Amino acid sequence: MVDMSTIVSDASQEGEIECDHDLHAFLCGLEADSSLLHPERLRERLIALDDLDAGFGGFDSEDSTRSMDSRKIHERAKALGTQLEAANAELYQSVRADIVRGAQLHTFLKRIQASVTQDRLVRPLPGFGFDFRDELVSGVLQLREPSEPNLQRSPEMVPYQPTPVRHILQLIAATALGADDVFVDLGSGLGHVPLLVSMVTEAQSLGIEVQAAYVASARECAQSLRLSRLRFIPQDAREADLSSGTVFYLYSPFNGSILTDVLSALRMESTRRPIKICSLGPCTRTVASETWLKASALPDMGRITVFDTQ
């Protein structure tokens, strides 16, 4: 009589051997590429880490049912992942040190734009997904995120999502932010946009955010990086003093009557001086319907749209 358990066991072992062979070849390729540890290869490291997680994630190296060779391969993968993560951490700390020393205008912008083609800098991919530049900025800012259940919000306030870095860079380029500008982020959340604007331009930045816990985190970050050209205020955007702003940004932080009231306040500001309003997300449709504003390009909720006063 044929022992089916033996057949199943043998088939399982053969499958494991074949799988281990493929993973071994893949791992050898990564281990042989010493350039992965170079600071500017962040994007490639992040891809490699994702691939390692896909191939080896969830593996228990103490699993006695695995062969010794299989466990050794997975231990190598774990060690390589640790090495790549350490290279990322070293890069983040290096950029933080550059910013603290005041070298941010050149070094930081150069690093986050590395390996990005010129057309993607001018007109980045639409949508709200993230890429390696967001990983870099997140690693550099090291923002402390408050626990969501402790936050209270109005039904007209949209849950916080950070603006993808590629769109922030597009905003900076499209508005040509300079030393005479005051950039105001209405509903700034953890402060990603004002922080980045302060790092790579000479403009003053102001983040207005109703959630005090978010403001506290943004202030901590600005202080740790010694950024002096920005402020964060815990305040409802409807009650904020907007008199100093020249460029205003809305990443659909609220809708309904709140958005209507804020746009009315901005219209009053536009009677006193020329201003620009930049939008991203669903609120773009509402902003585009304001007759006192003119879009610089066809409004697109998936990209930054810049509006000038008419």
Outline where the language-model segments fall:
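C-terminal substrate-binding/active-site "lid" region of AdoMet-derived donor-dependent transferases
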Residues: S257-Q310
